Amino acid sequence: MLSTSGRVKRKNAAPLQKVGQTKTSVVDQLEEALQQRDFSKATTVLEFYKTTNQPVGDLPINPWLAYSAFHMNDVSKALDVYKELLSLDGCDPMHYIHMGCCHFVNGSYAEAEECALKGPDCSLQTRLLFHIAQKTYDEDKLLVYHQKLKETVEDQLSLGAVHFYRGHFQEAIDVYKRILLETREYIALNVYVAMCYYKMDYYDVSLEVLNVYLQSHNNSATAINLKSCNHYRLYNGKAAEAELRVLIDLQRSTYNVENDIVKHNLVVFRNGEDALQVLPPLLNVVPEARLNLVIYHLRHEQIEEAYELIKDLEPVASTEYILKAVVNAFIGQKLDSEEHLKTTREYFNLIGSAQSECDTIPGRQCMASYFFILRDFPNVLIYLRSIKPYFLNDDTFLYLHGIACAATGSFAEAEESLTAVRSEKVKAEFSYMSWLMRAHIMNKHAKRAWDIYLKMETSAESFNILQLMANDCYKVCAFYYAAKAFDVLERLDSAPEYIEGKKGACIGVFQQVFAGQEPADSLFDVMKMLDMSVQQHANDPKVSQQFESILKVIKDWVKESKLKKK
């Protein structure tokens, strides 16, 4: 998950001057700085004149100082100035709303609402209260202030922003496009539209829209950052970092970029490198930092740490629901907790069946996961097959797709997916080896399954693999490898089922050699196995005699047929 925001403030910007005209008055300098959005310069000028008690023409210093400080993201300074203004008799009550905006930016929503309500009834007050209601999840107030919005550009921009934050990206796009049709000079709205398409996973469309803005504003920090995020989704981390380098270079020369966002996204682009150093301080600064730290812990099998980070998070966005579902799935399996698994199923089903998500890749992954937990593998395959072209190199997808195929009897497809897995970590898992061996055996590739067993070290898992090998090979009449597996099992544990299994498999090999379906060499191997059983059970004459009888029949036939080992 990436942070696609990124506000900037101009640094050391040279003022634009018209040929033959030089502005010298402080008012002209201040006006020029404000028009160029060089709020750092404006703040510096105003603070100088304030501390030296010099007038700035007829302009009131404090209101403009607070305005400039707010827009350069020095909110604490802006708050101090507004408090000073409001302590004076006859102050403009609009400053209560301005101070409310400062509290809103700081995340102090109760204070923001208190200040806003002290101000006059106006469109700015409505917009501020509208955003506060959205941030505090007060649906009743949100509806009230929504109805008070007018068709002005400012009010409609607020509506678009709230749609965006609530995950209603298509509705936000509709608002922004309507404004663009009416007021084409608001070209920066293309960035907002591009951000919505990014959130909807339309990364190529997002880039196309974004380039409209970048053609005329190629040093926009927000646009560059969003472009790098799109490159990450479309290509890889290296391509994304190359785009972000443009922003880092601008930081050194032209802009003071919000370093937190750059640092956060670099961690993502570098696949979690330095995550434990960079992300924890950003948990309450960059919203995506918490989610990415959870992902880092999951990748490193630190399930408890991931759970602690996300357990109190009330999910709003689909990514939050999905991640919380995944963490609960891990905890549920580890603790055998039906409560956690129930939460997992509810969240996966909620996102996967949502109208806005059901036809997206994450939405279909959610439905596949939901049915996987229910062990409803036919439905799992419906969803996984629909998105398979997007995950041909994803080991986790190939693994789960292979399991679902094998569980529904599609063993050829299962073998194809499971053999495509490259991760050594996945290949070492008992579950993976079990499903792959079963797929090999069911596709008449029993030797491949036997080779997997031969590479295993002696353990409880290898014993279980032998049992699977013996039984599955017997079922599909791969009697030679069934005999080899039962032979090892019998030597490890002389249980009756292994003895009977070995006798049956050896007779099966004899029948197949007799019918020309199995090479003669296999029968000679079987004769050695039978001879070993005769010796192993010397203290149990009944069992020993059974093996000896089978061996005698085979030897007589071999002699009569003049069969020779190749």
From Swiss-Prot:
- Does the keyword field hold Transport? yes
Any one annotated GO CC term: ciliary base
* Keywords annotated in UniProt: Cell projection, Cilium, Flagellum, Protein transport, Repeat, TPR repeat, Transport
Primary localisation category: other
> Which terms does the record give in the GO molecular function aspect?
intraciliary transport particle B binding
Q: Kindly list any coiled-coil regions of this protein.
A: none
- The domain of life is Eukaryota
Q: What changes when the gene is disrupted?
A: Defects in new flagellum formation.
Q: Where are the TPR repeats?
A: 59-92, 94-126, 153-186
Where in or outside the cell is it found?
Cell projection, Cilium, Flagellum
- What does the subunit comment say? Component of the IFT complex B.
Q: What is this protein called?
A: Intraflagellar transport protein 56 homolog
Q: Which organism is it from?
A: Trypanosoma brucei brucei (strain 927/4 GUTat10.1)
Question: Lineage from the top down?
Answer: Eukaryota, Discoba, Euglenozoa, Kinetoplastea, Metakinetoplastina
